[in-house]
Amino acid sequence: MNKKILKLGILTVAGAAIVAMKKSKKEKLVYSYPQTKVKKSDYKNTELNKQKKNSKGIYYSSGNYEAFARPKKPKDIEKKSAYLVGSGLASLAAACFLIRDAQMSGDHIHILEASNIAGGACDGVADPDRGYIMRGGREMEDHFECLWDLFHSIPSLEHPENSVLDEFYWLNKEDPNYSLCRATNHRGKPSENFGKFNIDAKGRKQIMKLFFTANEKLYDKTIEDVFDEHVFDSDFWLYWQTMFAFENWHSALELKLYLQRFIHHIGGLPDFSALKFTRYNQYESLILPMVEYLKQNGVIFHFHTQVTNVIFSFENDQKIAKSIEYIKNNETKILPLTKDDLVFVTNGSCTESTLYGDHHTPANGDAQIRTAGCWNLWKNIAKQDPSFGHPEKFCENVSKTRWESATITTSNTKIIDAIKRICKRDPLSGKVVTGGIISCEDSNWLLSWTINRQGQFREQKEDEICIWVYSLFCATPGNYIHKPMKDCTGEEITAEWLYHIGIPLDEIDELARDHANTVPTMLPYITAFFMPRTAGDRPDVIPDGCVNFAFLGQFAETPRDTIFTTEYSVRTAMEAVYGLLGVDRGVPEVWGSVYDVRNLLDASVRLMDGESLLGADLPMPVEKLKGWILKLIKDTDIEKLLKEYKLIKK
């Protein structure tokens, strides 16, 4: 009944609109829309000022004209220096843009990093004591406009005559990504619903309503405030939740932005055919080429340097970074700054205070969790002005921002055979294996696992595979190991995973104990950026009035884009550099699929698992109204478009 009502409502609105149009031609209806008071003599069609910069000193662009252009060197760039706090993807990207587009000399660029290695959350470590460690993975797609703008300029490590983008492009052309098994149940049996969303009319209505809700109406609202069991019990939500790591208590605003940002990939959600992956882990594939590029250009890295504060002065509506406070070799030091010294700070972190275990030790240690490092830095900066954001909204509820992951390394043939049975590919082929995560839909932990192209590490043995496992419900007892994941050793996590991939019960314990090595990692703030928020909680990339200071990364505010992506980090870096230095080149706008009627039509059919409101058989008199509409659009481009995207049958 609800489905019929929804169809009737949509068709009635469409029919009423057509009736109104016809009637207006005959009766010249007068509408009381507010009129803009502009004299005809004052109006002129023009595209002048189309590329006028906004208050942050940037403008957005699209198309090849801007993408292929090289900007002129900004005025007085030789007098300027840059200090980048943190060495994650956002900071390294900013340094690359300083060199490539702002044409700043590399020896004027300083990267201040608290640890002994660059890369931030984009890691991949072969720890000599613990083993291989990957805290997370990175999913990429065609329309990461800023990311690809950057990496087409970064030389490949293996073949410097090619760019990182060149090799990524060739790899994903020759070995395209897609999954042959998205979810399992009953200990490794493929889900019967593969490829379908199975969401009812009420659930689709809730998604549609969220999609069109103004951002302001979603401030501080959770997903539970806008969805109920009609969405949560669907396969759509299983796919969405496990792919993007959304929890029910996370931000409804961020979910809405995700729906709009990736509307062009709704069809690729069940089988991951929309995604692209690097050849190796992200540290080796993305971070190392950037570090090498920066070093070749003379950029100076300062490791073991923990920045604790940036001190500002406030003069005539200007906010000027005057000094950097930092700790090096257990000494507190102060670096004085001038207006020509630019400061870029990565505020907040999803991997801060990571807790590591090993095959025999859990990664729990909740008592050790702290908001040190970049969280305290952001708090110290935020105390000085409201425009610097509210870090406490994101970092003070660890039970709602954490989950746990683990890296399992094995060469055991029984385990590899079980993997082959599920993913229908050879994990040792060097090509796509799972094609993305496989979610165990009846797992108490909501455990998901994935195997990317092997080896994930250049030094990995030929017969070894690295499996990445993560669980959203890490405080719930498991199905085989009756303990929460957060209290489990690597061996116990392996046993739980082996249970869900169908290893015989009498073989699980031995295989977990003697034929794998697993490193668990607890990430207390991994989904901190998903917490409900309102305007001002995240600072603008360049806060109003800032002369020589910008924020970078996942907790800086930029319009329309979505966090937890490599694109977001690079976009904020590009905006920060272009804005502070006056680089006269457009920042590529977020891909506009949300404004493309073709993507909207396609998504509407796919969300209904191939059904269409206009293509379905409807009860009278709705069927008669539908027929009238179809007759009205016959032999028009509208009819062609609706047929192409299967809203009406050919």
Whereabouts are the PLM-identified features?
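Extreme N-terminal leader/targeting segments of oxidoreductases
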Residues: 4-82, 100-108, 607-650
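Glycine-rich Rossmann-fold phosphate-binding loop(s) that bind the pyrophosphate
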Residues: 86-88
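N-terminal Rossmann-fold NAD(P) dinucleotide-binding loop
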Residues: 91
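Glycine-rich FAD pyrophosphate-binding loop
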Residues: 99-126
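Rossmann-like flavin
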Residues: 157-264, 276-277
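Helical element adjacent to the flavin cofactor pocket in flavoenzyme catalytic cores
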Residues: 260-342, 347-348, 360-361, 366-375
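C-terminal segments that line or cap access tunnels to active or ligand-binding sites in enzymes
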Residues: 263-278, 340-342, 347-572, 578-595
